[in-house]
């Protein structure tokens, strides 16, 4: 734990951040939609101005909770956890930061919530679904979701993927330097 002094003279006590990107560890999953969180964290972990503790999970996404629980043993510590993951309910390139929200249908997030017994941690949700030219979400049909999330990004999606990576970098910097509330205000309005 460290102590930081703010310009208003109050002393803040806080623990350092823990950063994890969800994904599957095998090489065959590199570059897939489901591994976008893991891939983005690998890209940024050495580039951030403040260095969080980065957890490089060597388990499949749906079993992420156990290893994270070892690094985040209390509900209070969970508030300093940042999880970057794919999000079917957002169009590709869209990034949203949430805190204390439900897993929806994301099994990796469900595993974390079950292990930590809390939803109170930061999620950086990276949209992976296609959208119409007007920006309306085109979520894949239920029976096609597994193939979709385990599929690689198309060449035509690379520009939007670069945009998402840039926004995730901005989100992580804001969380680490100015806090989750400021990051949510800034990033969620994009």
Regions found by a protein language model. Name each.
Residues 2-3, 8-100, 110-125, 131-147, ...:
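Nucleotide and nucleotide-moiety/phosphate-recognizing core
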Residues 103:
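Conserved TIR/SEFIR loop-to-helix hotspot centered on a Trp-containing motif
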């Amino acid at each position: 734990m460290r102590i930081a002094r703010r310009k208003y003279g109050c002393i803040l006590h806080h623990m350092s951040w823990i950063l994890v990107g969800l994904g599957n560890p095998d090489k065959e999953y590199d570059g897939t939609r489901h591994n976008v969180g893991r891939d983005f964290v690998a890209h940024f972990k050495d580039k951030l101005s403040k260095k969080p503790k980065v957890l490089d999970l060597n388990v499949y996404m749906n079993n992420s909770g156990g290893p994270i629980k070892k690094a985040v043993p209390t509900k209070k510590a969970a508030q300093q956890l940042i999880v970057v993951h794919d999000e079917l309910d957002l169009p590709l390139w869209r990034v949203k930061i949430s805190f204390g929200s439900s897993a929806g249908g994301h099994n990796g997030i469900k595993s974390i919530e079950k292990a930590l017994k809390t939803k109170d941690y930061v999620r950086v949700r990276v949209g992976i679904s296609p959208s119409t030219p007007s920006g309306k979400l085109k979520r894949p049909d239920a029976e096609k979701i597994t193939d979709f999330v385990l599929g690689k990004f198309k060449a035509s999606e690379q520009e939007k993927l670069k945009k998402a990576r840039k926004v995730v970098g901005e989100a992580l910097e804001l969380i680490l330097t100015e806090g989750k509330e400021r990051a949510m205000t800034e990033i969620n309005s994009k």
